[in-house]
A protein has these predicted regions:
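Gly/Pro/Ser/Thr-rich low-complexity, intrinsically disordered segments predominantly at protein N-termini
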Residues: 1-159
């Protein structure tokens, strides 16, 4: 298993970094699941797993601020347009058949809100979120766009 760590920020050196990341390579699905069971659901880190590569990221205060701003904007827009949305925060989006897992900073069901209303989210049985928000200050070794795309989260990259 290979290990990489990164703690960087776009702020000056004396500032607190926005996030810290650890990358583990060669992690089997069973090892990943055992680790997740050990650390539990109530944790401050976010995870992403892509076919043997595991990223554990600890967000700091600066990392959280854009998520809050974007969430407020989405909620205000939905209220103005009078549409129902369901915000689920840092929900674990998992597909064992694809060997992929990701936890966005926050996510929203907008178009598919009625399909998940009152349900526990299991991507085997319900559609993925319509919007996933990622606030990244450092470059991840994992391509989260590929993970989201494989899970079926709508994606459009502006070029």
């Amino acid at each position: 298993m290979n290990l990489q760590t990164a703690t960087t920020s776009t702020l000056p050196q004396e500032s607190v970094p926005a996030e810290a990341r650890v990358i583990l390579k060669g992690v089997s699905w069973s090892t990943f699941k055992a680790l997740m069971a050990d650390i539990g659901e109530d944790r401050s880190c976010r995870i992403a797993y892509d076919q043997g590569m595991l990223e554990i990221m600890v967000p700091y205060e600066q990392h959280e601020e854009p998520k809050i701003l974007i969430s407020s904007f989405v909620e205000a827009l939905a209220d103005e347009l009078e549409i129902e949305i369901r915000q689920l925060g840092s929900l674990t989006l998992e597909r064992e058949d694809l060997i992929r897992v990701v936890e966005p900073d926050t996510c929203f069901y907008i178009q598919n809100e009625s399909k998940v209303r009152g349900k526990n989210i299991n991507l085997q049985n319900v559609p993925p979120p319509d919007l996933a928000v990622e606030s990244d200050y450092t470059h991840s070794s994992l391509n989260k766009f590929n993970i989201y795309a494989s899970l079926g989260v709508p994606f459009k990259r502006n070029r």
